[in-house]
Amino acid sequence: SVFRGLNVEENILAILQKSLQKDDEIKKTLEKLLSDFGIEHVRNSPSLSLSGGERRRLEIARCMAAKPNFVLLDEPLAGIDPIAIQDIKNLIQSLKSNNIGVLITDHNVKSTLEIVDRAYIIFEGKVLFEGKPDEIVNNKNVQAFYLGQNF
């Protein structure tokens, strides 16, 4: 989520100023995050005016400002257009390639399975099945209870 009363730059600065001391380091990191997440063009825009994809990129950029080892992304592919979905998937792949652990919860099973190493299908509050994406897709119980036969 983002601070709704702040613009894009202020949202990221709010996190950076808590973790970094030097102004030049803060500015350098801010510029890198804006660039890496493709949101330089909206840096002065109020966070409430962002599209779904822009907001999602800002949320992840804010998270990265804290230099985490792991991130939890709650429905990162929800409510965004197909182009933005691909952008977010690429960003998630980039996080993974930079050795940042990523835990995703999302109902967009098809897109999510394309970017994860392992998946857990939860049905009625319990783990129905866990495994690699191809194991999930080919599991008869997962097909019957969650994916449907035409997945």
PLM regions and their residue ranges:
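Catalytic Walker B motif of ABC-type/P-loop ATPase nucleotide-binding domains
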Residues: 71-75
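Q-loop/switch helix immediately C-terminal to the Walker
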Residues: 5-17
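Conserved catalytic motifs of ABC-family nucleotide-binding domains
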Residues: 67
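Hydrophobic anchor residue at the start of the ABC signature
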Residues: 60
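Conserved ABC ATPase "signature" region
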Residues: 13, 24-42, 93, 141
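Conserved ABC ATPase signature
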Residues: 46-50, 54
